Swiss-Prot record:
Other notes: Apolipoprotein C-I is present in acidic (APOC1A) and basic (APOC1B) forms in P.paniscus, P.abelii and P.troglodytes and perhaps also in baboons and macaques. The two genes for ApoC-I arose through a duplication process that occurred after the divergence of New World monkeys from the human lineage. In human, the acidic form has become a pseudogene sometime between the divergence of bonobos and chimpanzees from the human lineage and the appearance of the Denisovans. Pseudogenization resulted when the codon for the penultimate amino acid in the signal sequence was changed to a stop codon.
GO molecular function (one): phospholipase inhibitor activity
Keywords on record: Lipid transport, Secreted, Signal, Transport, VLDL
Position of the signal peptide: 1-26
Predominant location category: secreted
Family listed: Belongs to the apolipoprotein C1 family.
InterPro entries, A to Z: ApoC-1_sf (IPR043081), ApoC-I (IPR006781)
Classification via Gene3D superfamilies: Apolipoprotein C-I (4.10.260.30)
Gene name per UniProt: APOC1
Location in or out of the cell: Secreted
Key word Signal present: yes
Single GO biological process annotation from the record: very-low-density lipoprotein particle clearance
GO cellular component, one term: very-low-density lipoprotein particle
Name assigned to this protein: Apolipoprotein C-I
Length: 86
């Protein structure tokens, strides 16, 4: 049974290999590759700048301090309620 199933799979794989690359799968030109790498490098640089700017903005804002204070206050309230009920 295994041989019966594996033979058609092998034949299809061989046909695909022997057919060769399709028109869309042709070898890329060197110019396209270098321009693609340049675009990728530019994208990486832009992304890096945006991420740095975001983290700097978060560091400079007072959101982390406010969040920390809110959690501390909420924790204190919960502790007080647990003491009263105990």
């Amino acid at each position: 049974m295994r041989l019966f199933l594996s033979l058609p799979v092998l034949v299809v794989a061989l046909l695909m290999i022997l057919e060769g690359p399709g028109p869309a799968q042709g070898a890329p030109e060197a110019v396209d590759t270098s321009s693609g790498l340049d675009k990728l490098k530019e994208f990486g640089t832009t992304l890096e700048d945006k991420v740095r700017e975001f983290f700097n903005r978060v560091k400079e804002s007072d959101i982390p301090a406010k969040t920390r204070n809110w959690f501390s206050e909420t924790l204190q309230k919960v502790k007080e309620k647990l003491r009263i009920e105990s």
